[in-house]
Design a protein with these regions (language model features):
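Short, tryptophan-glycine- and acidic/Ser/Thr-enriched carbohydrate-recognition patches
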Residues: 29-39
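Repeat-blade elements of multi-bladed beta-propeller folds
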Residues: 23-31, 55-83, 104-135, 148, ...
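Short loop/turn segments that connect beta-strands within beta-propeller blades
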Residues: 86-91, 138-141, 182-185, 282-285, ...
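Sec/Tat signal peptide C-region and signal peptidase I cleavage site
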Residues: 17-22
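Bacterial N-terminal signal peptides that target proteins for export
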Residues: 1-8
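A structural motif specific to WD40 beta-propellers
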Residues: 49, 93-97, 143-147, 188, ...
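Bacterial N-terminal signal peptides
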Residues: 8-16
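A short helix->beta-strand "capping" segment at the edge of beta-propeller domains
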Residues: 37-55, 94-96, 231-244
Length: 471
């Protein structure tokens, strides 16, 4: 009765209840890879609201959370960095809420986190790295909840995990596809709930801090600050693994569709490792439902819209030197059995996922400087937009606008209906931080977020993460 009266009072006063904060449980936020989950349109008349300067390389997209974004980056000597940045335009010098780097992060980090509830999940390692870690952190404080070591050659965690019903699914390079239970962990041989182990870690951290304060009083010159390496390291429960030991090589993010997981496996020519195909797996046990052979490596990974699976493929990865002569392909498959609906050659590599709009447009970028829109079911062309530079990053779709960022650091806002240019914004010139954009834009709360990098420069140059809002 009290709840009914309270609701009636809210209605009578005309109060607005804000919607619950949407999770970001997979790459680009959803299976359609739109880079937007709250349904709010992005900026129509752009203005840079804030800039976070750095020398780290933001080669991957940030993931939005509650009042913050989580930005992976490559630091000095390719060290891993993950920072939580306040999205408040007035944050100023207090923009960085917390940050993780060495020695906590052991390897380079290009994995955009999955954000689910009060936690974030991401991995480290890239390219030739091996034996990475999968991490689960408290989203607000950045404290570790659990960690999972995955030993082996050519094993690395580049793609955002997909988290659904408490389980996380992810590609692990030569480790194939893995599934874990994020809610159950093992510590000192004992099984326990992840929530219970947080209390144990917090208690231990308090003890370490108290010891440090006591040591400082005795002899401040020899007091050693507490390290997270001294904390307990619970590990999540492995549910299943498929395609490991180099049978598959899965770097791109996997995607969930109903009771299935879709994963793109590449073939590494130099290492003669991996099977070039798209696999559809049973989410419960990892068994294979079907496979579809591919002509080119599926570096962009799969997207799902209705009963259609779209895979972006490329002859190259994220290497500007290989852009001349790059080839690409978009393949559309039936979700039920993997049969080909249509396939389309692209005059450039497609290295970021296809985004699928609510009205059935498949939109993708390529290294031939173009943004393409086709009918997702038939492949029939709808429109094409040409920029002055190649694209590595994919698009974000928010409202009736498509957002894309080219390698020269220029943001393009296009009309979803016909691809006509609405506005352009040169991030480098506006921020005096000339650089490249490898990542795909993210739109959250009506604002757009994107980072730059100078990974191909011989000099240390300023990089930025920018927030673009309405004038």
């Amino acid at each position: 009765m009290m709840k009914v009266r309270l609701f009636g009072l809210i209605v009578a006063l005309g109060l607005v209840i804000p919607p619950a904060r949407a999770d970001w449980p997979t790459s680009r936020g959803n299976a359609q890879r739109t880079g937007n989950v709250d349904g709010q349109p992005g900026p129509k008349s752009p203005k840079i609201l804030w800039v976070q300067e750095s020398t780290d390389h933001y080669v991957s997209a940030p993931s939005p959370g509650k009042g913050m974004i989580y930005a992976p980056a490559l630091g000095t000597l390719n060290s891993g960095v993950l920072s939580a940045l306040s999205t408040d335009p007035a944050a100023g010098a207090k923009r960085v809420l917390w940050s993780k780097s060495q020695p906590f992060l052991k390897l380079p980090t290009v994995c955009s986190p999955a954000v689910v509830g009060d936690t974030i999940i991401f991995g480290d390692g890239m390219h030739q790295n091996e034996s990475p870690m999968l991490y689960c952190l408290d989203a607000a404080k950045g404290t570790a909840i659990w960690q999972m070591s995955i030993p082996g050659p050519l094993i690395h965690l580049e793609g955002t995990p997909t988290v659904i019903d408490g389980n996380a699914y992810f590609g692990a390079g030569n480790g194939g596809v893995m599934a874990i239970d994020t809610r159950k962990v093992t510590l000192d041989g004992k099984d326990m709930a992840a929530g219970d182990v947080e209390k144990i870690i917090a208690t231990k951290w308090k003890e370490l801090q108290e010891k440090y304060e006591a040591d400082k009083k005795k002899d401040p010159d020899f007091a050693i600050p507490p390290s997270e390496d001294a904390l307990p390291k619970p590990a999540p429960k492995l549910l299943w693994q498929q395609g490991g030991q180099g049978k598959w090589h899965v770097d791109c993010p996997v995607v969930a569709a109903g009771d299935t997981i879709l994963a793109g496996s590449a073939h590494l020519d130099a290492e003669n490792s991996g099977d070039r195909a798209l696999f559809c797996l049973n989410r419960a046990d990892g068994s294979i439902k079907w496979r579809a052979d591919l002509k080119l490596n599926p570096w962009a990974g799969p997207s799902v819209g209705g009963d259609t699976v779209l895979v972006g493929c490329s002859s190259i990865r994220f290497d500007p030197k290989e852009i001349p002569g790059a080839k690409g392909e978009i393949v559309a498959l039936n979700l039920a059995d993997g049969s080909v609906k249509w396939r389309k050659d692209v005059a450039g590599g497609v290295v970021s996922p296809v985004a699928i709009s609510a009205d059935g447009l498949a939109i993708y970028t390529a290294t031939d400087k173009k943004v393409y829109a086709v009918d997702a079911k038939t492949g029939a062309p709808k429109w094409t937009y040409t920029a002055k530079a190649p694209f590595f990053g994919g698009v974000a779709i928010a409202g009736d606008t498509v957002y894309a960022a080219d390698l020269n650091g220029v943001l393009h806002a296009l009309a979803l209906a016909d691809g006509k240019l609405q506005w352009k914004l040169d991030v480098g010139s506006k921020t005096k931080a000339l650089g490249n954009i490898y990542a795909s834009p993210v739109v959250d709360g009506g604002r757009l977020y994107i980072g730059t990098c100078n990974i191909d420069s011989q000099e240390a140059r300023k990089t930025v993460i920018v927030c673009v809002g309405e004038k």
